[in-house]
Amino acid sequence: MVLIDGVEASVAQIQQIAATDIDNVSVLKDAASAAIYGVRAANGVILITTKKGVADGKTRIEYDGKVAFDNISSTWDLLTGDEYRSLKESMMNSSIQLAQDKGNAMVDYGGNTDWMKEITRTAVSHQHYISLNTSSKYSRTAASLTYNNYQGIVLTSGKEEINGRISTEFKHFNDNLKVNLNLAYTSKNQIPVEKSALRQVLIWNPTMTPYQEDGSYTPGADPLIYRNPINLLNETRRDDKYNIFTGNAKITITPLKGMTLTGMLGLDRTM
């Protein structure tokens, strides 16, 4: 069981929290401490407390940014166009009989293309985080916005993510009344790697060029078997988009010393 600021959290809510927004994490493992949460806490309770601003009456703005570069560390050892031509010539000059050449796969088109290199890139990813913390005599507020853009090594793949969060705490009547409000919004767009394009890299003729003289994609000799890997990546791009909105409110009243009344309300919606 996971509680964020005293309210039970879903997996989506946990994923929405940026590490820089977390103030404290504690674990309740003994039965006595977890008993107040019922049977759902049988395996323990994880308590996550988010930042709500420092109660010093000041306003603070923080920014953190990162840039990362990724390259493919190893790749398949495929024939180059020249190696392909040499192999074909050796086979033609030997007693080896070629099987049926489906789609003219063994034809020499005069190019010398490294298809794995053509569909990969140096991926540039960047992350940005900005936060605002403010407080007054009766309240504390912390707001943050995170933007992550992860570019995939394979063309067209990657992930873009935006996280917004605001946490506010109000105290009145000598702290006998406390109200906590937490709102979070996440927008994600993930573009997975098109695996069929990787298969085409393995079987595509290395003597063919990616583009024709007019700039259009070079078609496969047999379109039912061979498809241009670059064209395939652009044509079959799939964007997996979704938005998550979560929020919770908690009110704590202390009418008498040693007596506390607590009410909680939560919302979790994925669109």
PLM segments and residue spans:
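Soluble periplasmic/extracytoplasmic beta-strand elements of cell-envelope proteins
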Residues: M1-D5, N24-L28, V45-T49, E62-D64, ...
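Short acidic/polar hinge/loop motifs at secondary-structure boundaries
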Residues: D5-A32
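Short, glycine-/polar-rich solvent-exposed loops and beta-turns at beta-strand/coil boundaries
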Residues: Q15-T20, Y37-A42, R121, S157-E160, ...
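N-terminal periplasmic accessory domains that precede
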Residues: A35, A41-G65, H128-I130
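A generic beta-sheet turn/junction motif
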Residues: A41, V54, T134-Y138, Y147, ...
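Membrane-embedded beta-strand positions in outer-membrane beta-barrel channels/transporters
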Residues: V45-L47, Q127-Y129, N163-S167, A184, ...
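Surface-exposed loop/interface segments of Gram-negative outer-membrane beta-barrel transport/assembly proteins
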Residues: A55-G111, G152-S157, N163-T246, T262-M271
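Outer-membrane beta-barrel transmembrane strands
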Residues: R121-S139, T146-N148, I230-M271
